[in-house]
C-alpha cells in the first residue's frame, strides 16, 4: 500500500525522550543531555506558556536549581511563611536546612521557559506536539507519535503534569479515594508585591461562611502577586467548592489589606498528591514530578519534587528494567513522608476537624510550637539531615503510619 505524502510519518531515534517540558521534564532533559545522552524534549505547547501554579520556589527548590547551575534572576526574595486564621498569626522563617534561607517566586511562563532554554543550551532538542499512540512490547515502550513524528527512544521519561495524558495511555491510574487537591490561581496588582513573606490563610471560608479543608495564599512576585486557593478532597468526602468563584470571594476578603487590583489569568486544576497513583514505570519508562503525584499533600507544592525526581530518573538510566526499581526508589525517598502527610490531609477533609483544631493550632503556646513546624512541612523542608525534635517526630510518625497503612496506593507497580 502506498501511503499518501500528507500522511507519511518521519522517524526520530534518540537515547532519551522526555515528554513534558515543565520544571520536572526540562530538568530531566538538562541532566540527560549533560550526561551525554541524545535527548529530545517534547511539549504540547510552544513557549512561553502558562500553568496553574502558586509560583513559589522554596529553599529546597532553589537548592536543586543550584545543583543544576541554573540562576533564577528574580529580584524578589522572601524569608518564609506567615500563616493566618482562627484568630491568630504565626510567622515561620525558612529553616537553615539548605544553604540559602531565602525563597523566591517566579511565574511559570518565565520559569519554565528559562529551564527549557538551559536544556537546549545543554544539547537537548525541543519538539512541539502532543505525544500519543504508544507502542508497547510487554511493558517496554517501543515508540510513540508526536504529530507526524514517530519517536523511538531507548529511555522515556514522562513529565506531562497532573493530568498526565500520555502517562494514562501507558497505564497510569490515579486513586481518588486518597486525598487530592482542587485549586484556582490568578494574578493581581498590589502595592505590597515586594512583601518579604509569603502569606497563607488557613481559615478558608466559602461565601456561606463554611470553613473549607484547604487554604488561601498570596505570594508576592516583585511586580504583582499570585493569589490562589486550594481545597482537599477525596472520592467519599469531595470538597463542594467552585474554586474559581471561591477565589474571587477570597480576593474580595483580602482586597483592602493588600490593595488588590482586578484578578487576571484565572485558572484552575486538580492535583493528585502524595504518590497516590499506580503504573508509574515500565521496562524503559518512568513517570516523574506531578505525573507521578509527587506533590505535597498539605499544600500542593510540587516543583521541588519535580526537580528532584528528574535527577533521580536520569540516575536510573542504564538500569536493565525500572518497572519495580523506579517505584521502589520513590518509596525510599518519599514514602514515609507522603503517607504521613496524606494521613494528616485526610483528617482535614472531615468537616468537624478543622473548626475544632484550627483555633488550638493557631493561638497560644501550642500554635507557636506547632505551626512553624507545619509551615516547614508545607515548604517540603524536612530532610534526613535535620536533627531537631520536629524532624525526628516526622520520621518516627512516618514509620508508624507506614506500618499502619501498608496497603494504601503509593506508586504501586
At which residue positions do the language-model features occur?
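A short, basic/flexible loop-to-alpha-helix module at the beginning of a structural domain
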Residues: 2-13, 290
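Predominantly flavin-linked oxidoreductase catalytic cores and closely associated redox partners
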Residues: 118-258
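Conserved Rossmann-like nucleotide-cofactor binding loop
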Residues: 24, 47, 163
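FAD/FMN-dependent oxidoreductases across multiple families
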Residues: 233-316, 321-325
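A conserved beta-strand/loop capping segment in the N-terminal third of enzymes
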Residues: 62-114
Amino acid at each position: 500500500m502506498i501511503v499518501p505524502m500528507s500522511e507519511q510519518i518521519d522517524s526520530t531515534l534518540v537515547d532519551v525522550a522526555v515528554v513534558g517540558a515543565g520544571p520536572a521534564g526540562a530538568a530531566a532533559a538538562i541532566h540527560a543531555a549533560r550526561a551525554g545522552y541524545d535527548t529530545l524534549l517534547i511539549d504540547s505547547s510552544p513557549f512561553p506558556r502558562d500553568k496553574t501554579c502558586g509560583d513559589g520556589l522554596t529553599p529546597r527548590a532553589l537548592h536543586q536549581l543550584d545543583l543544576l547551575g541554573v540562576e533564577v534572576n528574580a529580584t524578589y526574595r522572601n524569608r518564609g511563611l506567615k500563616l493566618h486564621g482562627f484568630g491568630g498569626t504565626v510567622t515561620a522563617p525558612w529553616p537553615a536546612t539548605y544553604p540559602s534561607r531565602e525563597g523566591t517566586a517566579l511565574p511559570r511562563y518565565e520559569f519554565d521557559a528559562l529551564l527549557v532554554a538551559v536544556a537546549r543550551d545543554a544539547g537537548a532538542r525541543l519538539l512541539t506536539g502532543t505525544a500519543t499512540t504508544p507502542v508497547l512490547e510487554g511493558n517496554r515502550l517501543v515508540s510513540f507519535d508526536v504529530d507526524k513524528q514517530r519517536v523511538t527512544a531507548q529511555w522515556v521519561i514522562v513529565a506531562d503534569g497532573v493530568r498526565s495524558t500520555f502517562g494514562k495511555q501507558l497505564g497510569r491510574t490515579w486513586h481518588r479515594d486518597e486525598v487530592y487537591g482542587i485549586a484556582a490561581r490568578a494574578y493581581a496588582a498590589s502595592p505590597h508585591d515586594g512583601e518579604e513573606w509569603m502569606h497563607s490563610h488557613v481559615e478558608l471560608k466559602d461565601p456561606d461562611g463554611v470553613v473549607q479543608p484547604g487554604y488561601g495564599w498570596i505570594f508576592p512576585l516583585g511586580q504583582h502577586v499570585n493569589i490562589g486557593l486550594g481545597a482537599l478532597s477525596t472520592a467519599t468526602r469531595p470538597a463542594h467548592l467552585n474554586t474559581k468563584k471561591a477565589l474571587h470571594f477570597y480576593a474580595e476578603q483580602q482586597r483592602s489589606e493588600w490593595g488588590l487590583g482586578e484578578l487576571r489569568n484565572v485558572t484552575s486544576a486538580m492535583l493528585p498528591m502524595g504518590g497516590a497513583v499506580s503504573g508509574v514505570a515500565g521496562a524503559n519508562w518512568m513517570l516523574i514530578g506531578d505525573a507521578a503525584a509527587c506533590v505535597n499533600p498539605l499544600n500542593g507544592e510540587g516543583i521541588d519534587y519535580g526537580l528532584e525526581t528528574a535527577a533521580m530518573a536520569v540516575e536510573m538510566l542504564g538500569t536493565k528494567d525500572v518497572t519495580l526499581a523506579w517505584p521502589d526508589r520513590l518509596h525510599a525517598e518519599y514514602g514515609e513522608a507522603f503517607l504521613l502527610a496524606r494521613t494528616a490531609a485526610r483528617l482535614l477533609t472531615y468537616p468537624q476537624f478543622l473548626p475544632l483544631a484550627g483555633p488550638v493550632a493557631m493561638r497560644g503556646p501550642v500554635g507557636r510550637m506547632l505551626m512553624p513546624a507545619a509551615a516547614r512541612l508545607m515548604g517540603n523542608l524536612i530532610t534526613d539531615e535535620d536533627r531537631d525534635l520536629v524532624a525526628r517526630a516526622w520520621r518516627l510518625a512516618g514509620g508508624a503510619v507506614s506500618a499502619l497503612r501498608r496497603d494504601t496506593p503509593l506508586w504501586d507497580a
